Amino acid sequence: MSVTIAGIAGSLRAGSHTRALLRAAAYDLPPGIRLAIWDGLAHVPPYSEDLEAGPAPAGVAALRALIAGAGAVLIVTPEYNGSIPGQLKNALDWASRPRGGAVLEGKPAAAISASPSPRGGARALADLRKVLTVTGAGLTETELAIPQVHTQLTPGGHIADPALRGRITALISDLAQHATAASPALAA
């Protein structure tokens, strides 16, 4: 099995915990799984149906190409005012278009929320799951809300808690299995 998973961090902040968490997860991947982390969120313009008639803006084209070329998508979101960040929602709006031919339709997807709060961004996780479901993504049942994320990463960029590391690895393995089931060519 060889599966590429598109990793999308929902924060624009350079020192983002969600981006750091994605990078840390890449250190502990099971064999045959690759995490392609996308850093182009800031380059996606506001969604406008008027722009669909012409070529996609460069940031949108890059996002769509990443998702189309991956077997699955893993999104890690912070919680901003009880929901997902606006820029992440905007990117998902672009990836959900055009209806009937969007790169998210049927794509296996998993969601993680991470927050310094004790709830781990659970409200953002619920909203992200709702958005992914509406887009037609093949959302897995496995999900994680990671509380006190600022204490979960080592200065070297690894996941400090072995139990959390195991849960993230299990989520990624489950997502890869969904990708393989959705596209048997990945199992070769």
Give the ranges of each region predicted by the language model.
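A general structural signal for well-ordered alpha-helical segments in protein cores
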Residues: 5, 18-22, 44, 60, ...
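Helix-loop-strand module that forms the ligand-binding subsite of alpha/beta enzymes
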Residues: 55-135
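N-terminal beta-loop-helix "entrance" segment that forms/cooperates
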Residues: 40-57, 152-156
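N-terminal beta1-alpha1 ligand-phosphate binding loop
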Residues: 2-33
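Glycine-rich phosphate/pyrophosphate-binding loop and the adjoining helix
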Residues: 138-188
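Short beta-strand elements in bilobed, periplasmic/extracellular small-molecule ligand-binding domains
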Residues: 33-46, 139-147
